[in-house]
Structures are given as C-alpha cells and as structure tokens.
C-alpha cells in the first residue's frame, strides 16, 4: 500500500503523476483549520506534506500524527516551525539550489531599475509627459563601477557578486556570518563589518533569511549610516527591515532610493507610503518567479519528498537531525 500525502499546491500534470506513482495523494487548497477539519482522516494518516507559503505549526502537526516529511517549494522556511518538526522527528526539505541564478537576476534588475529610474520614467512617458528633450529631472545614476555591498553571501549573494564584478566592474563588499574565501578569490570581494559596508557601499543589497537575529536588522540607525546617495535593495525577507524606518529614511533623504521585492506584510497594503514614492521600485516577491524556475522548484520539491520518505535526506534537508 502506498504512503499517503497531503498536497496543498497545484502542480503540473507530469509532476502530479510522478507523485501519484509513489503516493496516495489528497489535494487541498490550503492548510487552514477548516480545510484540515474537512479532510481530517487524510491529514491524520498522511506521512508526507508538500506545498508552499502556508503556515506549518504545532497546531497543524497535532492533526498529523503520522507525518514523517514535509517538503516546501521554496528556499525560505520562516513559515514553518522547524523546532516543532524536529521534536516529532519530521524532516523538512526545501529547494535551495534551483532558484539561485533567477533570484540574482531579479536583484540585478532591481538595482538597474532603481538606479536608472526605469519604472518612474516609463510611467511618465505613458502619462504623456515626454513632450520635449529630457533634462536632469529625468536622469538616474550609474551602476557600473559603483561599490556593491552584499549582506548575506550565500548562493544568491555569490551569483550577484559574479554579475556585478564581471558584468559591471563593481567593487564588492560583503558582510556575512563568516568569511567566504571563494568570493574573495573569484570576485576580489572584501569582507567587512556591517557598519563599514553601510558607510562605503553605493548599493546595499540584503539577501538574508528571516531569523530571530535578522529580524529588523535594518532600522533607523543602519539607514542613517548609509550614504545619502545609496540605493537599498531587499530581496531576502521583508521583516529583516523595519519598514517604517525605511520609509522615514526615504522621505528624509537619508538614502537615495530603494528596490524592494519583499515586505513586512505581503501583499503590501495599498495604503503603504512606499507606493507613492517615485524613488521606490516595489515588486510582488518575484525573486524566483519565472516559468522555468518555478517548474524546477516544484520538481525539486517533489523529488525531495520522494527521497525523504525513502530515507534519503543527503541533500536539501533543513533538519537532518530529525532523522536520527
């Protein structure tokens, strides 16, 4: 008899068929309490859980006593209570490698769009404001040869450093929990403390997961240390930044502009002051959102769950100690 799983994400037919070859699959729209109650027996017997974006917490786990593995279609897992899974010997799988290059493309796009004011001037053209040769009021700033500061030198940080160093001749500074010798050797990146990075960088790019240590790592003090000409990019997690402090820094001219893919609350409120600022490029968490990469993420998550329920957790496992 096949193990049973809960699937709370719509998958392409070929990936669904791959799952069905190994498991009895119950598809649900979400993990809300009313959904769990409606499918109580399926949740109670499920050994696997696959999906994205929904909260996986102790309350849910209490309804899933047979659960052995959860697979998230994402690299981040701040919506999952990992400690609760580990305590129940449930492994958590994620997709850390397949989205690296695509997210780095997004960060580079935010840097370019923000510096060159692409969104702002495109909207002005559409509004019929281009009635004569443009002047300084339409100008942006250069990207090439500017100093890039990367906060979080993981896979995505490395891919961004590669683009910046080789493509735009940008000196690269970085701050991370530990020095990254490959970044220093390949891109001549310079490790420095956060304060030094903030003071010297023309672009400050944040690519950090959300943890207790990184929550509101960027606040009024950090923005005050940045150059008034600096551009701030956040493509990690929204709550790493105190959004009110960012808004104040932009309003007060403490920094030049911001390119944001993530926010403290998502979707971003239509009342957010960020939406009324011409020096802000705000996009709806599109870091990995290409057809190719999202398919590859789903395929990776499917394979991760198949492997995990066969006892294979050599790669992409967040908490391998849970299998001990």
From Swiss-Prot:
The protein's UniProt keywords, in alphabetical order, are:
Cytoplasm, NAD, NADP, Oxidoreductase
EC number(s): the record gives: 1.1.1.79, 1.1.1.81
- Give the annotated active site: 237, 266, 285 (proton donor)
Give the CC-aspect GO terms: cytosol; plasma membrane
Q: Which InterPro entries does the record match to this protein?
A: D-isomer_2-hydroxyacid_DH, D-isomer_2_OHA_DH_cat_dom, D-isomer_DH_CS, D-isomer_DH_NAD-bd, Glyo/OHPyrv_Rdtase_B, NAD(P)-bd_dom_sf
Query: What is one Pfam family matched by this protein?
Result: 2-Hacid_dh
What is the top EC class of this enzyme, as a single word?
Answer: oxidoreductase
Q: What is its main location?
A: cytoplasm
Q: Where in the cell is it found?
A: Cytoplasm
What GO molecular function annotations does the UniProt record carry, in alphabetical order?
Answer: glyoxylate reductase (NADPH) activity; hydroxypyruvate reductase (NADH) activity; hydroxypyruvate reductase (NADPH) activity; NAD binding
Query: What reaction does this catalyse?
Result: glycolate + NADP(+) = glyoxylate + NADPH + H(+); (R)-glycerate + NAD(+) = 3-hydroxypyruvate + NADH + H(+); (R)-glycerate + NADP(+) = 3-hydroxypyruvate + NADPH + H(+)
Q: How does it assemble?
A: Homodimer.
HAMAP family linked:
2_Hacid_dh_C_GhrB (MF_01667)
**What does this gene product do?**
Catalyzes the NADPH-dependent reduction of glyoxylate and hydroxypyruvate into glycolate and glycerate, respectively.
The UniProt entry's sequence similarity note says: Belongs to the D-isomer specific 2-hydroxyacid dehydrogenase family. GhrB subfamily.
Q: What is this protein called?
A: Glyoxylate/hydroxypyruvate reductase B
